[in-house]
């Protein structure tokens, strides 16, 4: 861990009402004496002059001193809050750098110091960046939940439960009770099942939190002239795609990024899927399948005037059979204004079926509500946390090891192998909060922060 004293502008570059310079480290007191002529009383606002080396006043403003470890970084911290002109702030930083042992902070280094000094865990540190980068009110609320430790609490509880069970298994192996077969008495199995259930619940919440942060990717797919581009326009609320009666008008991927009541949604319109000898259209269809394979959800667009079927396996079995196994599909029967179909949503063999008219807007609002529900709109209003892709990956790894441990217990009664799977699950979960995390990962995470944070 670095012992350098660092300085950076904590407010956005440019012109503003207030500009803040932040200093953290052992030399913060030296900076105070050099620039202010005195050390402010800790945690009190001190209005004073900010002076250069010749004693001339650079600016006037508020100085705040926080004595470590009772500060954001856990070190001595000095904040100089002056006027928000960039020239003035640059002069002030230049003056601070004249004090021996001070350097410019790297992106995210203040938060990194807070993490290294146990003021924050890694999920809380990441939540700071997510709160700053939030693109919707819901994302900001969820990031704040993570910053306040909601996600960390869930992960710590899982780590504690896995660790406790692992220690119990290892102790039972080392000190066996000859009268009781601890692997088959049900206690370990019950404890393991409870952990797996809790992890599954956390995974579901984290997936919703990831959607809040990164958005849900929804691909509109189907045969040519089914109304895919019209639906894109209806969902986006503007004419993003060209719509004609000519089949195959859309030949490339079109993207729109919208928010549904604060929930980010990435809508992808694709070329109509069919056999064709047209080289350009073939490229568009190949790109369409690439988008489908990486989607969170597919809206299977069906021209309602061509078939009465509602089961996608009856409508186009080859298309459904080619989709990734775990990809969710919503069937959208279009042109209800022509077919006269009831707009009510129905469930058909596990698939949600919506009847709409993308041209007139009939049923589109109900489809939007469906997409909001898929993104966990209600649960996130009630207070969900935000999550990143690396969190989901770590949870998946932990779940995989717990399932392998379950097999070792149920099939082979292999205590040593169960203990090893529990250890691996513990390590995967601990990576989320940063207890066991490589320096490379830490560098990647904090380098994405803004300077001064």
Curated annotation (Swiss-Prot):
Its cofactor is K(+). One of its GO terms (cellular component) is cytosol. Its EC number is 3.6.-.-. GTP binds at residues 225-230, 244-250, 269-272, 334-337. K(+) binds at residues 225, 244, 246, 249. Keywords: Cytoplasm, GTP-binding, Hydrolase, Magnesium, Metal-binding, Nucleotide-binding, Potassium, tRNA processing. It is found in: Cytoplasm. Residues 215-376 form the TrmE-type G domain. One of its GO terms (biological process) is tRNA methylation. GO terms for molecular function: GTP binding; GTPase activity; metal ion binding. The keyword tRNA processing applies. The keyword GTP-binding applies. SUPFAM superfamilies: P-loop containing nucleoside triphosphate hydrolases, TrmE connector domain. Binds 1 potassium ion per subunit. Mg(2+) binds at residues 229, 250. (6S)-5-formyl-5,6,7,8-tetrahydrofolate binds at residues 22, 79, 119, 453. InterPro entries: G_TrmE, GTP-bd, GTP-bd_TrmE_N, GTPase_MnmE, MnmE_dom2, MnmE_helical, P-loop_NTPase, Small_GTP-bd. Belongs to the TRAFAC class TrmE-Era-EngA-EngB-Septin-like GTPase superfamily. TrmE GTPase family. Homodimer. Heterotetramer of two MnmE and two MnmG subunits. Exhibits a very high intrinsic GTPase hydrolysis rate. Involved in the addition of a carboxymethylaminomethyl (cmnm) group at the wobble position (U34) of certain tRNAs, forming tRNA-cmnm(5)s(2)U34. This is tRNA modification GTPase MnmE. It comes from Shewanella sp. (strain ANA-3). The lineage of its organism: Bacteria, Pseudomonadati, Pseudomonadota, Gammaproteobacteria, Alteromonadales.
